[in-house]
Amino acid sequence: MCRASQSPWTRDLLCELGFHYDSNALNDDLPYWDMVPTGRRMLILPYGFDTNDMKFFHPNGFVRPSDLSDYVGAALDVLVAEAGQGRSSLLSIGLHLRICGRPAGFQAVRLILARLAELGSKIWIARRRDIAAHFRTENPIDVSRE
């Protein structure tokens, strides 16, 4: 059992089972291709734990709903500014029903949604599968470099 971390075989198993991407990496702001031990390529859609409501359960984490929404808002401000300079990024916002589905936690969701609405066309709100499809189209595997 691996709990939240991966085993050395996880990505191979994901490929074998037909998964199109892995979102269990915390190491980047952009999707990328990774070579798995059997030589296959796996699309990695990194996940950011800093913008995750689980921080409400961490002793040094978020306390008030505005802690999460302010943090996400600050991240959005930086990423929108960077996008204005031509740099793309991926911001994952992790929400769990058992946390932000509760009344006080849901206030954070409302605040985040309001901020996203303010940004309008400056951002793309997408499901992970849509991000994966877009990345595959824009960054196909170059088999000549294999």
Predicted feature descriptions by range:
Residues M1-R87:
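Active-site-adjacent pocket scaffolds in enzyme catalytic domains
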